[in-house]
Curated annotation (Swiss-Prot):
Coiled coil: none annotated. Catalyzes the rearrangement of 1-deoxy-D-xylulose 5-phosphate (DXP) to produce the thiazole phosphate moiety of thiamine. Sulfur is provided by the thiocarboxylate moiety of the carrier protein ThiS. In vitro, sulfur can be provided by H(2)S. Belongs to the ThiG family. This is Thiazole synthase. GO terms for molecular function: thiazole synthase activity. 1-deoxy-D-xylulose 5-phosphate binds at G156, A182, G183, N204, T205. It comes from Salmonella agona (strain SL483). The lineage of its organism: Bacteria, Pseudomonadati, Pseudomonadota, Gammaproteobacteria, Enterobacterales. PANTHER family: THIAZOLE SYNTHASE (PTHR34266:SF2). Keywords: Cytoplasm, Schiff base, Thiamine biosynthesis, Transferase. GO terms for biological process: thiamine diphosphate biosynthetic process. It is an enzyme of class 2 (transferase).
Length: 256
């Protein structure tokens, strides 16, 4: 069970809505993933009507919506997008995204912290997408963010946990949930993140661009479940030396 702010989730896998070939395929994949929290970009949704091709199927599926501010380049733009989303969707939950460079899509740490502090004061439940910077993540926690979402690698890159060393520090020091977001390319990456101690992962591109998104979503669901179970089981310590699983000489002595 995962708790963030006032909500609890059975699944530790969050999903996105971009890059799917159709809305029907998107919903089928989300259902196969078991995800209960789904993020969607405000720039891709018609907020004036709930029969939008992306929004309507999600509402019907009964998932918790997490609008994001993707496309915002400044704190001011992100705050404006957040206010529009709250008014249109009736939710104060928000994935805060500010990335001014369209090529790399790396989050702006200064603008993100500035916007996060303002949005928390306005009553938003803020989940900020940020770099894997332990100092920044701690500052975001201190201003009241409900979780932090450090990247594993650049958005859509499928590179995996390239920031593993920093993620481990963030997980160790955080008192709010840590959701590894961006760069997760295959199910084993998700398993690794959960084994490390992350509370959840957010996956979009890896599922949406697969030849069979529904099958890939199922694979991610199982991978996340495996990661959670492995962490709860408490793995053995890593050792430099070999350690025999059975006696090496005792049986020979018994036969002598």
């Amino acid at each position: 069970m995962l708790r963030i702010a006032d909500k609890t989730f059975d699944s530790h896998l969050f999903t996105g809505t971009g890059k799917f070939a159709s809305s029907q395929l998107m919903v089928e994949a989300i259902r196969a993933s078991g995800s209960q929290l789904v993020t969607l970009a405000m720039k891709r949704v018609d907020l004036r009507q709930h029969n939008d091709a992306i929004l309507a199927p999600l509402i019907e599926a009964g998932v918790t919506l997490l609008p994001n501010t993707s496309g915002a380049k400044t704190a001011e733009e992100a705050i404006f997008a957040a206010q529009l989303a709250r008014e249109a969707l009736g939710t104060n939950w928000l994935k805060l995204e500010i990335h001014p460079d369209a090529r790399w899509l790396l989050p702006d740490p200064i603008e993100t912290l500035k916007a996060a502090e303002a949005l928390v004061k306005q009553g938003f439940v803020v989940l900020p997408y940020c770099g894997a910077d332990p100092v920044l993540c701690k500052r975001l926690e201190e201003v009241g963010c409900a979780a932090v979402m450090p990247l594993g690698a650049p958005i859509g890159s499928n590179q995996g946990l390239e920031t593993k060393a920093m993620l481990e520090i963030i997980i160790q020091q955080s008192t709010v949930p840590v959701v590894v977001d961006a760069g997760i390319g295959v199910p084993s990456h998700a398993t690794q993140a959960l084994e490390m101690g992350a509370d959840a992962v957010l996956v979009n591109t890896a599922i949406a661009v697969a030849d069979d998104p529904v099958m890939m979503a199922t694979a991610f669901r199982l991978a996340v479940e495996a990661g959670v179970l492995a962490r709860q089981a408490v793995p053995g310590n890593r050792s430099t030396y070999a350690s025999a699983t059975s006696p090496l000489t005792g049986f020979l002595e018994a036969l002598a």
